[in-house]
Design a protein with these regions (language model features):
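A boundary/linker detector
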Residues: 1-9, 28-29, 82-92
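Histidine-centered nuclease catalytic patch
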Residues: 27-58
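Short Cys/His-centered divalent metal-binding micro-motifs
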Residues: 56-81
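Short cysteine-rich clusters marking metal-coordination/redox-active sites
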Residues: 20-26, 63
Length: 92
């Protein structure tokens, strides 16, 4: 059975959500949302397949406010950003 994007994201959320956690950005205790470290629209623009867009290495948990604030931008200060960009570029 092929696992689609929504199923994989849902399974990841089930494992990592459900209780309030401390948001790594604002350090407040809040319910978390799933954020893509490298935004999906950028992965699509460079021509990566859907599997790369659903790479669990590219997921992080942020509170709703921080997730909305980050939006579709890349946070170059995030410790996973450069390794993920290298990984995805090398896969082209």
């Amino acid at each position: 059975m092929k696992v689609n994007k929504r199923t994989k994201l849902y399974e990841w959320q089930k494992r990592n959500m459900g209780i309030e956690q401390v948001c790594p950005r604002c350090t407040k205790l809040r319910e978390m949302t799933v954020e893509h470290i490298i935004p999906v629209h950028l992965l699509q623009e460079i021509g990566l397949q859907e599997e790369a867009m659903n790479d669990e290495d590219n997921f992080e948990l942020l509170c709703y406010s921080c997730n909305k604030f980050k939006g579709g931008r890349i946070d170059m200060a995030h410790p996973k950003t450069i390794p993920l960009l290298k990984k995805y570029i090398n896969s082209l």
